[in-house]
Amino acid sequence: LVKDIIPYVEKHYRVIANKDNRAIAGLSMGGGHTVMATSNNPGVFGYIGVFSMGIRNVDETVTKQFQALKASGVKLYYVGCGAEDKLALEGSRRLVELLKTQGFNYKYNETPGGHTWFNWRIYLSDMAPMLFR
């Protein structure tokens, strides 16, 4: 993603090539990839969306990664999860607690329902207008 896709897009398309004009979001396993890609590459994305996914553990490594991510100037970290999502709810709440502790600008949207496209459409519709302000 960071070494191949972003450079390709920036070379072949007319885009503003900086983190303040770059967003990433993913749902379910893609949300997990979003967490990993952004926490391992601080300073690449200004806007981050994680739908129906979170983090398993908050240890020293994760804390340091999120400190670096916060220091990189993330403008928005959006987390959405269904209240009946047995797969991701605990991890989503854990992620939100970490964001709160680290002082991120974040939004958490916990909706009725589970791990469904119905909810993911809600989160995308909610997050999209917040981008690039």
What are these regions (language model features)?
Residues 1-133:
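Non-catalytic cap/lid and distal C-terminal segments of serine-dependent acyl enzymes
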